[in-house]
C-alpha cells in the first residue's frame, strides 16, 4: 500500500512526541527509585490511564474487533471477564499493595516485595519470581515488537526487517532515557489516543451505514447468530472466556502502577477513571468489529483485505472513512497500544535484572547512579533479545504468549491477593502457591482437560496450596504479623473527604 504524506507526517509527529516526553522524564529521574517506580509520585489520573494502557496491547484495536467481526457479539464475553477482573483487582489489591510494598522495605519490584513480606532469608522467592518475569516478559516483548513491525510493514510498505527496527526503536529510546516516568506519561497520552479512536470510529461507521437501527438490521440479515451472545458457547466456554479476568491479580506491569501511586487514598479516584476508560475502550473495540460487519456487508468491494485478515477491520475502516490526517491519528492508536505495553514490559524486565538479581546478589551497595545506568543497559539488552526472537515472526517460542497471561495470573495472582489480605500467610505458602499455580497452567495447557482455560484451575489450586502450606507450617513471626497489622491499619485509615469511597 502506498503511504500518504499526511499519514507519514502524523506517525512521525506522534513518535517524536513520545521521545520528547522521554527526555522530559529524564530530567526528573534522580535515582533508581525514580527510574523504576517514578518515586511513587503518580497522581490518580496518570495511575489510572497508565495502568489501562499498559494492560491493553494491540489486541484491543486489532484482535478483539477482528474476533467480533468474524464471530459476532458472542466474542464479547472476554471483554466482560476482563472488566470484572480489573475492577476486583483495583478494589481488593491496588490500595493494599501500595501500602504493603511501602511497609516491606519500600519494595520497588514484585520479587522485592515477596522477599520482604515473607522475611525470605533464603531469597528463593526473589530468584524464582525474577526468573519467571524475565522469561515470560522477554517473550511478551518479542510479541509486541512483532505487532509493531506488522503495523509498519502493512502501513508503510516496509520490509519486515526494517519494520521490526522502526517499530521498536522509539519505544526502546524513551524507556531507556526516561524510565518509569517516561513510560507512565507516554501511557497517559497513548491511553487518550486509544479511547479517542475507539469512540470516534464506531460512531462514524454507524452513521455511514444509516444509523444504529439500520446497522443492526444489516447485521441480523447477514446472520442472526451475529447478535446471539451464546452462539456456539457452552458453560465451560463462557467461564473460560470470563476467566481471563483472573490474570489481572498477577501481572507485574499492571501491579507496578499501583505501587507507584502517590497515595493509597488516590487509588479510589484512579479506579473510577481507569474503569471508565476500560469500559469505553472495550465497548468501542467490540463496536468496531460488530458494526464493521454491517459496513462491509453494504460495501463488499471494499472488504477484500478484511476478508483475508479480520484483524485489519479497524485499519481498513480508518483508511476508508476518514481523510488521511485523521486516519493517521487513528492508526497511531494501534502503535500507541503496542508501545504502551512493550515499554512497561521492558521496564519490568530491566527492574527484575537490576534490583532482584544484580543488586541483590552482585552489588548490594551499588550507588543509585550505577543502578540507574545498569537499569538502562538492561532495557537495551532485553530489547535486543526480544528483537532477536521477533526476527522470525513464525518462531514457535512466540506461541508461549498465549498462556503467559495465564502463567502470571496463576503463579503470582493468588500470592499477591493472599499476601495483602491474609496475615497468616507464610513464605512456604507463597512458594507453594507460586509453584502449584505455574505447574497447573503448564500441565493443564498440555492436556486441555474439560476445555477449560488453564488460568482457572491454576488460580484455584494455587490458592489451595497457599492456604494448606501456610497452615501446616510455623506461624509467621511476631514481627511479620505486626508489620501486616500496621500496613492494614494504614490502608483502612480515613481518607480525605473528597476521595472518600461511597
Curated annotation (Swiss-Prot):
Q: What happens when the gene is disrupted?
A: Mutant is defective in proline transport. Shows reduced growth rate when grown on propionate as sole carbon source.
The protein's matches in CDD domains, at most eight in alphabetical order, are given as: SLC5sbd_PutP
Control of this protein's activity: Activity is stimulated by phosphatidylethanolamine and phosphatidylglycerol, but not by phosphatidylcholine and cardiolipin. Proline uptake is inhibited by the sulfhydryl reagent N-ethylmaleimide (NEM). Proline, in the presence of Na(+) or Li(+), protects the carrier functions from NEM-inactivation.
Q: List all topological domains (Cytoplasmic).
A: 27-41, 89-126, 184-192, 256-275, 341-370, 419-427, 470-502
The answer to whether the entry has keyword Cell inner membrane is yes
Q: Residues annotated as region Hydrophilic?
A: 27-66, 88-124, 151-162, 185-189, 214-231, 249-274, 296-319, 341-370, 392-397, 424-430, 446-448, 476-502
Its recorded reaction(s) are:
L-proline(in) + Na(+)(in) = L-proline(out) + Na(+)(out)
Q: Which UniProt keywords apply?
A: Amino-acid transport, Cell inner membrane, Cell membrane, Ion transport, Membrane, Sodium, Sodium transport, Symport, Transmembrane, Transmembrane helix, Transport
Which subcellular locations apply to this protein?
Cell inner membrane
Q: What is its main location?
A: membrane
**One GO term (biological process):** proline transport
Which residues carry the site feature described as Involved in high-affinity binding for sodium and proline? 344
Matching entries from InterPro entries are given as: Na/Glc_symporter_sf, Na/Pro_symporter, Na/solute_symporter, Na/solute_symporter_CS, Sodium:Solute_Symporter
Q: Any stretches that span the bilayer, and where are they? A: 6-26, 42-62, 68-88, 127-147, 163-183, 193-213, 235-255, 276-296, 320-340, 371-391, 398-418, 428-448, 449-469
Give GO terms: molecular function aspect only: L-proline transmembrane transporter activity; proline:sodium symporter activity; sodium ion binding
| Function as written in the Swiss-Prot or TrEMBL entry | Catalyzes the sodium-dependent uptake of extracellular L-proline. This protein is also capable of using lithium as the transport cation. Also catalyzes the uptake of propionate.
Give the family this protein belongs to, as stated in its UniProt record. Answer: Belongs to the sodium:solute symporter (SSF) (TC 2.A.21) family.
Q: How does it assemble?
A: Has been isolated from inner membrane preparations as a homodimer.
This protein is called what? Sodium/proline symporter
Q: Tell me the organism.
A: Escherichia coli (strain K12)
The encoding gene: putP
Amino acid at each position: 500500500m502506498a503511504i500518504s504524506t499526511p499519514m507519514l507526517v502524523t506517525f512521525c509527529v506522534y513518535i517524536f512526541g513520545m521521545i520528547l516526553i522521554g527526555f522530559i522524564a529524564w530530567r526528573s529521574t534522580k535515582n533508581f527509585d525514580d527510574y523504576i517506580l517514578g518515586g511513587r509520585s503518580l497522581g490518580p489520573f496518570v495511575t489510572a490511564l497508565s495502568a489501562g494502557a499498559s494492560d491493553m496491547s494491540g489486541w484491543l484495536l486489532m484482535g478483539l474487533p477482528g474476533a467480533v467481526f468474524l464471530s459476532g457479539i458472542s466474542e464479547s464475553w472476554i471483554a466482560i471477564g476482563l472488566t470484572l477482573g480489573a475492577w476486583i483487582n483495583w478494589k481488593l489489591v491496588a490500595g493494599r499493595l501500595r501500602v504493603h510494598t511501602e511497609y516491606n522495605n519500600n519494595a520497588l519490584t514484585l520479587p522485592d516485595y515477596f522477599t520482604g513480606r515473607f522475611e525470605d532469608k533464603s531469597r528463593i522467592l526473589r530468584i524464582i519470581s525474577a526468573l519467571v518475569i524475565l522469561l515470560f516478559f522477554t517473550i511478551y516483548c518479542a510479541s509486541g515488537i512483532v505487532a509493531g513491525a506488522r503495523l509498519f510493514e502493512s502501513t508503510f510498505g516496509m520490509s519486515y526487517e526494517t519494520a521490526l527496527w522502526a517499530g521498536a526503536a522509539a519505544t526502546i529510546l524513551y524507556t531507556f532515557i526516561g524510565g518509569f516516568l517516561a513510560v507512565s506519561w507516554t501511557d497517559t497520552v497513548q491511553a487518550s489516543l486509544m479511547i479517542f479512536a475507539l469512540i470516534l470510529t464506531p460512531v462514524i461507521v454507524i452513521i455511514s451505514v444509516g444509523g444504529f437501527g439500520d446497522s443492526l438490521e444489516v447485521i441480523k440479515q447477514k446472520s442472526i447468530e451475529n447478535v446471539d451472545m451464546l452462539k456456539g458457547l457452552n458453560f465451560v466456554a463462557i467461564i473460560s472466556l470470563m476467566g481471563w479476568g483472573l490474570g489481572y491479580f498477577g501481572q507485574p506491569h499492571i501491579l507496578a502502577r499501583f505501587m507507584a501511586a502517590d497515595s493509597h487514598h488516590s487509588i479510589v479516584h484512579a479506579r473510577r477513571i481507569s474503569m471508565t476508560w476500560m469500559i469505553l475502550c472495550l465497548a468501542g473495540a467490540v463496536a468496531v468489529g460488530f458494526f464493521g460487519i454491517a459496513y462491509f456487508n453494504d460495501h463488499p468491494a471494499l472488504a477484500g483485505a478484511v476478508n483475508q485478515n479480520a484483524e485489519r477491520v479497524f485499519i481498513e475502516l480508518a483508511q476508508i472513512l476518514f481523510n488521511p490526517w485523521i486516519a493517521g491519528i487513528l492508526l497511531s492508536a494501534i502503535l500507541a497500544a503496542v508501545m504502551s505495553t512493550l515499554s512497561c514490559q521492558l521496564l519490568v524486565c530491566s527492574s527484575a535484572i537490576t534490583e532482584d538479581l544484580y543488586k541483590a546478589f552482585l552489588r548490594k551497595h551499588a550507588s543509585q547512579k550505577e543502578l540507574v545506568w545498569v537499569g538502562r543497559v538492561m532495557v537495551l539488552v532485553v530489547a535486543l533479545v526480544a528483537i532477536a526472537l521477533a526476527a522470525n515472526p513464525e518462531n514457535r517460542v512466540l506461541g508461549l504468549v498465549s498462556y503467559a497471561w495465564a502463567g502470571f495470573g496463576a503463579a503470582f495472582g493468588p500470592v499477591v491477593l493472599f499476601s495483602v489480605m491474609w496475615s497468616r500467610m507464610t513464605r512456604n505458602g507463597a512458594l507453594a502457591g507460586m509453584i502449584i499455580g505455574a505447574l497447573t497452567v503448564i500441565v493443564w495447557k498440555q492436556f486441555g482437560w474439560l476445555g477449560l482455560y488453564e488460568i482457572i484451575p491454576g488460580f484455584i489450586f494455587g490458592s489451595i496450596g497457599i492456604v494448606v502450606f501456610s497452615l501446616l507450617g510455623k506461624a509467621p513471626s511476631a514481627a511479620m504479623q505486626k508489620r501486616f497489622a500496621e500496613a492494614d491499619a494504614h490502608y483502612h485509615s480515613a481518607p480525605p473527604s473528597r476521595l472518600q469511597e461511597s
